[in-house]
Amino acid sequence: MDSVPDAQAFERYLAAHPGAVQLWLGGHTHTNPDDTCGGKSHIEHKWGTYFLNVCALTRYHAPRTTLPMSRLLTFVDGSAEVRVQCYLHTSQHAPQGWYPKAERTLHLSRPFRW
């Protein structure tokens, strides 16, 4: 907005302040929950931040690779663990429903509080 290039600005902030952001949720994918690209999966950890690709509610945008899926994050008051589950809305990749292979438990740097 102010004509100052900001590429990598937020990455530099996260590197200088590890854990300042615990979870970064993104909702854009064109692939299945088992896919990786450049050695990276749908859930990655860097700079003390978990980056999660949490959903793709499209089926026909890129029909060969895109499938509708979403994630459920479960927090428990007083716990630093977050359960991440993957739900497949169709059976084009695996049976429709919860997809245990993509389930993860994340460990935050501090407990969750309501």
Model region roles, listed by residue range:
Residues Q22-L23, Y50:
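Proline-centered loop/turn at the N-terminus of a beta-strand
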Residues M1-Q22, D34:
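Active-site-proximal segments of metal-dependent phosphoesterases and phosphodiesterases across multiple
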Residues N32-W114:
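Binuclear metal-dependent phosphoesterase catalytic core
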Residues G27-H28:
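Active-site glycine-centered loops adjacent to acidic/histidine catalytic or metal-binding residues
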